[in-house]
Amino acid sequence: MAAKEVKFGRDARERLLRGVDILADAVKVTLGPKGRNVVIDKSFGAPRITKDGVSVAKEIELENKFENMGAQMLREVASKTNDIAGDGTTTATVLGQAIVQEGVKAVAASMNPMDLKRGIDAAVEAVVADLFKKAKKIQTSEEIAQVATISANGAEDIGKMIADAMEKVGNEGVITVEEAKTAETELEVVEGMQFDRGYLSPYFVTNSEKMMVDLDDPYILIHEKKLSNLQSLLPVLEAVVQSGKPLLIIAEDVEGEALATLVVNKLRGGLKIAAVKAPGFGDRRKAMLEDIAVLTSGQVISEDVGIKLENVTLEMLGRAKKVHVSKETTTIVDGAGQKSEINARVSQIKAQIEETTSDYDREKLQERLAKLAGGVAVIRVGGSTEVEVKEKKDRVDDALNATRAAVEEGIVPGGGTALLRAAKALSIKGKNPDQEAGIGIIRRALQAPARQIAHNAGEEAAVIVGKVLENCSDTFGYNTATAQFGDLISFGIVDPVKVVRSALQNAASIASLLITTEAMVAEVPKKEAAAPAMPGGGMGGMDF
């Protein structure tokens, strides 16, 4: 086992603080509309330019093990905030640094670290309650666009695009961000439920120009197993032919005699039909077939529930206004499912999302939720160079997450103003002077984000903060982008409560741990062995 080095008390905390400062100083320059860029070296390819706090934090690894521990703990603040709210990483880092700096000073002045922590926790609770009280719910598309614009560092086109996407697919809908092949940034919306399975035979195509199958007002047969035997399929085919409607078959597979008969019927013009494989695998396939059944008001034909294919009636089939099938995808538009049943299914999936611990499962459940709840939108981010596209994609991701958070818990005035004003809520008293000091640490730390935003814009931070606090209106603040004081809500400068709250809670949580640290253990760095000496003697027989 390698030898370990141990640091105690003040020495340990000072080294932690040094690591915290190095990481925070690199991250905080990106805060606000006039935040600066950080250039990150990549071992291959062009350097990456970003204004995304968490991307900068992830790149920092320090040589000194004790300092690195401090940096990594602060990095945890940024990643945790990013996981919960998807934005606010830089604000969380700035708050974390401010709380740690003040806390380490207090501990050095012989205050009790545990009482400081109790004071900090009580103060954070009071501030979060105040933020919820002042939160304004988001209703209109304009408000959504404002939040997205701010989080995208003032890019109005991105803000509007995200607002359009959320309007079209609903707040629960899936919005994915991809890199475009062109210089333009564009939005594509897929209405209805789409899954990644195309037609099983090109002979089903009805639109030969686009190689698509378009079925109007079709019946939908949802079958869990393979279909290869024609006999069991005949009764339902005859019933559909008599109704004069098209038919979409979704099954594990359709092969052999069954597929051949369907193709022959289609070519002879007797039946407008298409067959596709069921989406997903294993248990997820069963769940997705159930989703399709709920959406189209049909039943999953499965021997598990005692329904045989030969006994199927038209009432058991699903219905939809339109179905489009391409070589790779199937889209069901406007299924005939009951609103109440769809909502019940949505609630069930939401409950599963809450319970799951796997990120992969959560992502797949969210996809299912979106397909049921409204549809899928894709924002394709374009740019002139690869570096520009990556930087813009970072901002679009941030903006999208911030917007979702805003819809969830509401908004408060932005630019660090909500936290500045929340200091008024700290009229609570600690049980002793050390707890009072903990409350005071948060009171001072709440000014840090507003000061940093002003500083990054080249303004005098103390003057800006002083002027904002002179005015008693909750929404009065400073617009750094235009260098104006006024009503921040009407300027459209707002922050999601979820982002501000998560930033403060995570910063205080990690900072409290750092303040109450009394010892640190790390491996002793290995000394590099000196390079061996060159063998002597020269090369015989060579005279110069």
Curated annotation (Swiss-Prot):
Instruction: Supply the EC number(s).
Output: 5.6.1.7
Give the matching HAMAP family.
CH60
Any one GO CC term of this protein is: cytoplasm
Q: Name one GO molecular function term.
A: unfolded protein binding
For this entry, the protein name equals Chaperonin GroEL
Query: What's this protein's function?
Result: Together with its co-chaperonin GroES, plays an essential role in assisting protein folding. The GroEL-GroES system forms a nano-cage that allows encapsulation of the non-native substrate proteins and provides a physical environment optimized to promote and accelerate protein folding.
SUPFAM superfamilies recorded: GroEL apical domain-like (SSF52029), GroEL equatorial domain-like (SSF48592), GroEL-intermediate domain like (SSF54849)
Give the taxonomic lineage as stored in the record.
Answer: Bacteria, Pseudomonadati, Pseudomonadota, Alphaproteobacteria, Hyphomicrobiales
Q: Which GO BP terms, alphabetically?
A: protein refolding
Q: What's the subunit arrangement here?
A: Forms a cylinder of 14 subunits composed of two heptameric rings stacked back-to-back. Interacts with the co-chaperonin GroES.
**Could you tell me the keywords of this UniProt record?**
ATP-binding, Chaperone, Cytoplasm, Isomerase, Nucleotide-binding
**Reactions catalysed according to its record:** ATP + H2O + a folded polypeptide = ADP + phosphate + an unfolded polypeptide
Entry annotated with the keyword Isomerase: yes
Q: Which residues cross the membrane?
A: none
Q: Where does ATP bind?
A: T30, L31, G32, P33, K51, D87, G88, T89, T90, T91, G415, D495
Keyword field contains Cytoplasm = yes
Tell me where in or outside the cell this protein is found.
Cytoplasm
Q: Which domain of life is it from?
A: Bacteria
Coiled-coil blocks: none
Q: Which InterPro entries match?
A: Chaperonin_Cpn60_CS, Cpn60/GroEL, Cpn60/GroEL/TCP-1, GroEL-like_apical_dom_sf, GROEL-like_equatorial_sf, TCP-1-like_intermed_sf
